[in-house]
């Protein structure tokens, strides 16, 4: 059995962004040192409710890769409709090389209305982008 930690950086207590990032780092290091299998970072934008503060799971994984040794690094998920698919594929591949093969990839089209206002259009964009990436 594998255990992973879903690190959805939230800010219910109105902490500084620097403090939130430091806490995420500490969680990644703790999980690595205590033999967790993976840590997953999410992508949400615009902080609509005033609490979600994780806008770039690849950057979070890159930071965690530099501070850990064995834990797998996942994105849950990269919102494909916000990214150039070629650039996203290159960024994922670079992170995989930098982390010595520890990357887990999650791709989605967004879940909240502000992330996927036109769900049918977003689904088409997601399908087109995935055909370009072809992971």
Where do the PLM segments sit?
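Conserved strand-turn element in the central/C-terminal portion of the radical SAM core barrel
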Residues: 74-82
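Structural motif
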Residues: 42, 76, 106-108
């Amino acid at each position: 059995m594998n255990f992973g930690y879903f690190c959805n950086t939230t800010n219910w207590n109105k902490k500084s962004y620097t403090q939130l990032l430091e806490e995420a780092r500490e969680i990644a290091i703790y999980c690595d040192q205590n033999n967790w299998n993976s840590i997953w970072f999410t992508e949400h934008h615009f902080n609509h409710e005033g609490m979600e503060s994780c806008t770039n799971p690849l950057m979070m994984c890159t930071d965690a890769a530099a501070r850990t040794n064995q834990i797998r690094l996942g994105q849950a998920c990269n919102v494909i409709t916000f990214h150039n698919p070629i650039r996203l594929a290159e960024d994922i591949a670079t992170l995989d090389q930098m982390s010595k093969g520890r990357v887990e990839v999650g791709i989605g089209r967004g879940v909240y209305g502000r992330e996927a206002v036109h769900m049918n259009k977003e689904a088409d964009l997601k399908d087109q982008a995935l055909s370009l990436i072809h992971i």
